[in-house]
Every structure is written in C-alpha cells, then in structure tokens.
C-alpha cells in the first residue's frame, strides 16, 4: 500500500528459517525497536520476543521514496515494523501481536482514536 516491495522468501537471504521455523505453528524471535519511533514509545527500546510466522518481508530499501520509516528490526537485517510518523497511528508489524500476550500495540491503537 505504501509502494514498497516484498522480499519473497527470507530464508534465501538470511540462510535460516528463524521467521517461520515450524510449518503451521507460531514461533518467537527477537526484534529491536528503533529509538525515537512510535514503536519504541509503545514497546520500549529494548529487544523483545514477538510471535512470528512469516517467510516474506518488506525490502529494506523499498520505502525510501515514501513517508514510512522502519521502526523495528530483526538481528538478520529484516525490517519487522514500519510506521508513518506523520499519521496519528499508522503502524505495521511483520509479527503476529494477536498471537501473543503483549497487548500494548492494541492499547495504543485504541488510545489513538479521538
């Protein structure tokens, strides 16, 4: 929707199945929020484990021409969250927050509604 491009199969670049290790089941991996972003305001700046199940991702250089910026990364260089800093709440994450116990993203979304 933002005009970015999709990396079709992450294991081809990263060499592991870390983002989708067991077919049909969520796993967890660590992401690190970028300081100064909405994601870091909501989740903190320290690395955190998130529920994951994906083999695709947004190409890291494909949003340079948009208002979006990446706001969390996996250690292998895969973008894990992006946001539009000019919007009230436009955040996209590559992980599955609905599959975990951490409701902070959902609470922040609800709180952003006027």
What are these regions (language model features)?
Residues 1-5, 11:
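Catalytic nucleophile loop
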Residues 11-114:
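Amide-donor transfer/coupling interface in amidating biosynthetic enzymes
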């Amino acid at each position: 929707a933002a005009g970015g491009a999709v990396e079709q199969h992450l294991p081809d670049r990263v060499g592991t199945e870390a983002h989708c290790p067991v077919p049909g089941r969520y796993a967890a991996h660590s992401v690190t929020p970028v300081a100064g972003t909405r994601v870091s305001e909501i989740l903190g700046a320290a690395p955190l484990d998130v529920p994951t199940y994906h083999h695709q991702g947004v190409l890291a250089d494909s949003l340079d021409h948009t208002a979006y910026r990446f706001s969390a990364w996996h250690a292998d260089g895969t973008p894990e969250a992006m946001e539009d800093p000019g919007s009230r709440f436009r955040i996209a994450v590559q992980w599955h927050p609905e599959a975990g116990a951490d409701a902070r993203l959902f609470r922040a979304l609800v709180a952003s509604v006027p």
